[in-house]
Amino acid sequence: MKLPFAESYKIKVVENLRKSSREEREKWIKEAKYNLFNLQSQQVFIDLLTDSGTGAMSDMQWSELMKGDESYAGASSYYKLKEKIREILGFEYFLPTHQGRAAENVLFSVLVKENDVVPGNSHFDTTKGHIEFRKASAVDCTIDEAFDTQVEHPFKGNIDLKKLEEVLKNNPKEKIPFVVVTLTCNSSGGQPVSMQNIKDVHQLAKKYGVRVLFDSARFAENAYFIKIREEGYQNVSIKDIVREMYQYTDMMTMSSKKDAIVNMGGFIGIKEEEIFRQASTFNIMFEGFITYGGMSGRDMNALAQGLDEGTEFDYLETRIKQVAYLGEKLDSYGVPVQKPYGGHAIFVDANKFLPNLPREEFRAQTLAVELYLEAGVRGVEIGTLLADRDPQTRENRYPELELLRLAIPRRVYTNNHMDVIAAALKNVYDRRSEITKGFKIVREAPIMRHFTVELERA
């Protein structure tokens, strides 16, 4: 008999969860202005808002916390992290930052100017926000298959080379600071980019004299999918795949709170000394001295250990199979989700779930609120609220995909929790015809509004 799959870890510490009544949840979500970011954590039973910084660190990571060097300059923890980044990712120069958006802020302060054009694969919210804050434009060049949730394409994060070349041809290279490759592509459903596409994008960018930047938050999950899905990589280790991937970029930004499995931290990897020197000035201004950059020594130690653990096959297999378990459950219930299942989250297709709800009433946000009311499960909208308004017209931008993201924290929940999530969504799906009203905006920020938006029933 073939042995069943089991997790590659055992549980050493637990945290109690509190269940709540529907009446309590109705009160709490109304007080939160129907914005799930405004809920207190104790008002949530299963928290799938994000996989960023919410994972469980290992005993080895906890032991590294005790060995952190908190020297202001030249801490040994910095050099430990520097060596680990060089070993795994191959960057000679790096700058620590407190998280991924800080890495973007520092690097984009050097490279992105007004009226620039930044092509890539479905830039995530902070990436697009930092670009548009600088009065530049983000151009989505993702393949069309990414926008049909039922198409089984193994690499829906791929960049369409024709779309990319159109941007590169029609704009002077001085106006294109870099091409962004997001690994994996969060906004299209945690979808990976193939090694071949990475190579092709790099070659095309170099043809036009443009740099390549990897948004690397989930780079290890991307490497796992290359190993599993791309011909010729089945017998290659995750670390070797990662090293090959990073031959084809000039720079990287990293939110370490994802694939390095820490609660806080990020960094920039740079291959050109001059960009490193310019970025160092902004790092000192915004983050801190270049050998800590907003991170404590103990956090740098835990991050170095996490980079090792996060690029191990057994860990990645356990993590991604749990995400797939939830996807398969939902699929068996008829709930429409992005296929194939992503690396860090399941993305529910709100357009197919609530097709009769006017898109102006925020389908994915409505679905997120309904799931919370049903079972105390907190997901997040990846749709019209997140897309923000057009900077010129101030009209809503309606993305091709309107998704409810269920991001699974690493090494935190069991499959019993996945069963609860799936059953709750099935219950909402069974009564979807009764959901006829969504939300309207009461108050919003001019950029990245989804974090603080206030809503009321339409």
What is the predicted role of each segment?
Residues 2-36, 40-55, 61, 70-94, ...:
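Conserved PLP-enzyme active-site core in the AAT-like
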Residues 103-106, 347-350, 390:
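Beta-rich nucleic-acid/ligand-interaction surfaces
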Residues 137-140, 270-278, 298, 373-400:
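Flexible glycine/proline-rich, aromatic-decorated loop/lid segments
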Residues 255, 341, 382-385:
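Acidic carboxylate-rich catalytic motifs and surrounding loops in phosphoryl-/glycosyl-chemistry enzymes
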Residues 275-277, 355-363, 411-420:
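Short, conserved charged micro-motifs
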Residues 310, 374, 386-458:
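PLP-dependent enzyme catalytic core of the Aspartate aminotransferase-like
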Residues 323, 351-378, 392-399:
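Active-site loop ensemble at the mouth of alpha/beta enzyme cores that anchors a bound cofactor
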Residues 323-324, 338-349:
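Conserved glycine-rich beta-strand-loop-beta hairpin in the small C-terminal domain of fold type I
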